[in-house]
């Protein structure tokens, strides 16, 4: 690869179930706006456009937003930017429905402007199309599972949007694995479009997604777009933690408080980063990209230099030893039945998951086997 080539210009297929091609990083647009600034920090329209311009110039084409981000500012600004740059068809645009996107209009009865049902879905999509100044959405997510809509209603209503041309692909976020598997099986059984990508919280300090969501994605042929991969500002060097303590994280996110757990994982990331001569956050980003195939981290920033600081992570290769060092920063418990299958629940030592035939202890008692390995993540190109 030429050293002058844009950092994000080696594209990848989104998932085995979706042929669309996207940049290796997805730009998160929840940071774009001034509404809810006390919780999420502020990013002006001028700065948002500068970030978008840089991302696009580096080859980035995958952008994520939602109907309710920043009281609609995120979608509106994205629409204005694409219209002014005349590049809508270059962009793979993802948005979401389920949030109460008109909550700032206090005079309205809100009950059907949010939720996962058909009316909320159609109203939200039409509003998003208007704000985004486009006739179609590349990827529509169900933002979260609210236990109200039936699987048949959901999948038929979503498929109607695909058939209408308003939506090209379907995704789901922040939902249990059993819901996604059940919905996809229903879709396949009835000739409907299935979910092709999952979005959820995942980073080196928060690995819950690995229990059931990640194995489900691999089995369902789904891609994975993790958010929070940089721990929402809580991965830092010791100097960075001192700065945060002094400023009380002024201007940044203040959703989840900093913990000693964040500090301990950060220390290990810093050790790996120092040994490789790269910034800590690049290692944190490279970690999730090399854990599984079809992983496209969502990175949200409020300044251009925040983005330039992490983009080189797409070319960082971590050794198995470095990945193990990061994961040994704390004890992750996959829980039952995974520890039963691996046999670790019966033994002294750390808990381990059983996600492939080579680690199922009952099987290993029967003989010596050679197994076909599963799909591997793309190795970074230097």
Curated annotation (Swiss-Prot):
Organism this protein belongs to = Aspergillus parasiticus (strain ATCC 56775 / NRRL 5862 / SRRC 143 / SU-1)
Entry annotation: catalytic residues: 69 (proton donor)
**Family classification:** Belongs to the aldo/keto reductase family. Aldo/keto reductase 2 subfamily.
GO BP annotations listed: aflatoxin biosynthetic process
Q: What class of enzyme is it?
A: oxidoreductase
Its domain of life reads Eukaryota
Give the function comment from the record. Answer: Norsolorinic acid reductase; part of the gene cluster that mediates the biosynthesis of aflatoxins, a group of polyketide-derived furanocoumarins, and part of the most toxic and carcinogenic compounds among the known mycotoxins. The four major aflatoxins produced by A.parasiticus are aflatoxin B1 (AFB1), aflatoxin B2 (AFB2), aflatoxin G1 (AFG1) and aflatoxin G2 (AFG2). Within the aflatoxin pathway, the norsolorinic acid reductase aflE may play a role in the conversion of norsolorinic acid (NOR) to averantin (AVN).
Pfam families noted in UniProt: Aldo_ket_red
Give the encoding gene's name: aflF
Annotated pathway: Mycotoxin biosynthesis; aflatoxin biosynthesis
Q: What is its EC number?
A: 1.1.1.-
Is Oxidoreductase there in the keyword field? yes
Which residue numbers mark the site Lowers pKa of active site Tyr?
A: 96
Q: Which residues bind NADP(+)?
A: 64, 173-174, 199, 228-238, 302-310
Q: What is this protein called?
A: Norsolorinic acid reductase B
Q: Where does substrate bind?
A: 143
Kindly state which keywords UniProt assigns to this record, in alphabetical order. Answer: NADP, Oxidoreductase
A GO MF label: oxidoreductase activity
């Amino acid at each position: 690869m030429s050293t002058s080539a844009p950092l994000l210009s080696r594209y990848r297929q989104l998932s085995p179930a979706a042929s669309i091609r996207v940049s290796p990083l997805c730009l998160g647009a929840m940071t774009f706006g001034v509404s809810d600034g006390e919780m999420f920090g502020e990013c002006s329209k001028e700065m948002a456009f500068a970030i978008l311009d840089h991302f696009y110039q580096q080859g980035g084409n995958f952008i994520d937003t939602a109907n309710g981000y920043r009281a609609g500012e995120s979608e509106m600004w994205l629409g204005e930017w694409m219209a002014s740059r005349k590049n809508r068809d270059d962009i793979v645009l993802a948005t979401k429905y389920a949030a109460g996107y008109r909550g700032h209009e206090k005079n309205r009865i809100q009950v059907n402007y949010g939720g996962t049902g058909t009316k909320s879905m159609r109203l939200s999509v039409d509003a998003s199309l208007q704000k985004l100044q486009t006739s179609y959405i590349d990827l529509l997510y169900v933002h979260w599972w609210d236990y109200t809509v039936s699987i048949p209603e959901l999948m038929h209503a979503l498929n109607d949007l695909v058939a209408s041309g308003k939506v090209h692909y379907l995704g789901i976020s922040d939902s249990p694995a059993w819901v996604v598997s059940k919905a996809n099986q229903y879709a396949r059984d009835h000739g409907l479009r299935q979910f092709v990508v999952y979005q959820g919280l995942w980073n080196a300090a928060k690995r819950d997604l690995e229990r059931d969501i990640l194995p489900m994605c691999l089995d369902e042929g789904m891609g994975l777009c993790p958010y929070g991969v940089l721990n929402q500002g809580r991965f830092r060097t010791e100097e960075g933690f001192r700065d945060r303590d002094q400023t009380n994280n002024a201007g940044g996110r203040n959703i989840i408080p900093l913990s000693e757990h964040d500090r301990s994982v950060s220390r290990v990331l810093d050790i790996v980063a120092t040994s490789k001569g790269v910034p800590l956050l690049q290692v944190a980003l490279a970690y999730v990209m090399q854990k599984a195939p079809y992983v496209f981290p969502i990175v949200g920033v409020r300044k251009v230099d925040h983005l330039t600081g992490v983009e080189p992570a797409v070319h960082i290769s971590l050794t198995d030893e470095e990945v193990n060092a990061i994961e040994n920063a704390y004890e992750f418990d996959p829980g039952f039945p995974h520890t039963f299958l691996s046999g670790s629940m019966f033994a002294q030592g750390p808990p381990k998951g059983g996600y492939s035939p080579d680690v199922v202890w009952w099987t290993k008692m029967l003989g010596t086997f050679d197994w076909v390995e599963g799909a591997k993540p793309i190795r970074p190109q230097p």
